[in-house]
Amino acid sequence: MAAHELKEALETLKETGVRITPQRHAILEYLVNSMAHPTADDIYKALEGKFPNMSVATVYNNLRVFRESGLVKELTYGDASSRFDFVTSDHYHAICENCGKIVDFHYPGLDEVEQLAAHVTGFKVSHHRLEIYGVCQECSKKENH
């Protein structure tokens, strides 16, 4: 499935006139395969062995291109660091308050929330974001030992 998503994402970039460099391909592939919502620094550290001449700025520039193409969402939280999420479908995030781990989940009951909000408020709704905060299973196990 990830190979298909990567191929589609590369096609999207090509259609918008973006040149596919080896670094760009690797960064996108990392995002498609990552469920960890990495920071730019995480991506840089994961790929620096394969691309020793690549800088963190290169990663940020590519993430900006991906975001502008609609392939990646930038998730900002209160700690001033951005995390990046490859956009496959609408989903929400459960975030561990101890370790910062982010887990995706989907709740079909919220699919109509934008229409309801638009109806109730008169807003022209563009999107929404839901975050649930708590303690992940791994951190809970550590606390109980």
UniProtKB/Swiss-Prot annotation:
Domain of life, source organism: Bacteria
> Some GO term, biological process aspect, for this entry: which one?
regulation of secondary metabolite biosynthetic process
State whether keyword Cytoplasm applies: yes
Q: What is a single molecular function from GO for this protein? A: DNA-binding transcription factor activity
Tell where it localizes: Cytoplasm
Q: Which keywords does UniProt give here?
A: Cytoplasm, Disulfide bond, DNA-binding, Manganese, Metal-binding, Oxidation, Repressor, Transcription, Transcription regulation, Zinc
The cofactors required by this protein are: Mn(2+); Fe(2+); Zn(2+)
A Pfam family annotated for this chain is FUR
What changing residue 139 to H does, per the record, is: Full repressor activity, but no modulation by peroxide
Changing residue 139 to D: what effect? Full repressor activity, but no modulation by peroxide
Task performed by this protein: Hydrogen and organic peroxide sensor. Represses the expression of a regulon of peroxide-inducible genes such as katA, ahpC, ahpF, the heme biosynthesis operon (hemAXCDBL), fur, perR, zosA and mrgA.
Under the subunit heading, UniProt states:
Homodimer.
Under which name does UniProt file this protein?
A: Peroxide operon regulator
Organism annotation: Bacillus subtilis (strain 168)
- Gene encoding it? perR
